[in-house]
């Protein structure tokens, strides 16, 4: 196992579009992790998501309880022999689409599937969020 340098962490975030976002529990119970499409813009150091939720959903309860989150993305760079993973922690804040437009453009080009069947500017069903990064780390694992 080898620690990734910041440049490699940026590469993993820039080159991928699917990760796992873990929201802090409002009751101190286990966090709420879920897969999510994301975009990262290295020029602005912006990590962005657009999330859909309803007022009575578990996701909404967790989002409104504590803004502290963890985010994880991984990739297999060489089949069955090299994997890299990145963990990011910080504060998840509601934002505007114009504030995170470069990161969302990255989301559109990197995601492996359509992240949501509605358009990004349909604010009645989706909300843009930015993860304000406090810390990140990455690891590379090699087999053989």
Please name every model-derived segment:
Residues 12-13, 62-63, 107:
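A generic structural signal for nonpolar/aromatic side chains embedded in well-ordered alpha-helices
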Residues 80-144:
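Charged, gly/pro-rich active-site loop segments
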Residues 51-57, 69-76, 107-118:
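Short acidic (Asp/Glu) patches
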Residues 51-53, 64-75, 84-93:
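Active-site-adjacent structural patch at catalytic or cofactor/ligand-binding sites
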Residues 16-54, 71:
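Short beta-strand segments
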């Amino acid at each position: 196992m080898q620690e990734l340098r910041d440049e490699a962490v940026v590469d993993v975030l820039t080159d991928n579009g699917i990760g796992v976002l873990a929201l802090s529990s409002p009751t101190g119970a286990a966090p709420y992790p879920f897969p999510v499409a994301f975009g990262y813009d290295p020029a602005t150091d912006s990590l962005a998501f657009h999330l859909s939720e309803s007022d009575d959903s578990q996701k909404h309860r967790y989002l409104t309880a504590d803004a502290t989150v963890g985010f994880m993305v991984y990739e297999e760079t060489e089949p069955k022999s090299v994997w890299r993973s990145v963990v990011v922690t910080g504060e998840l804040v509601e934002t505007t689409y114009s504030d995170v437009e470069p990161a969302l453009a990255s989301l559109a080009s990197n995601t492996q599937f359509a992240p949501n069947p509605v358009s990004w500017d349909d604010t009645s069903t989706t909300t843009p969020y930015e993860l304000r990064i406090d810390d990140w780390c990455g690891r590379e694992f090699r087999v053989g």
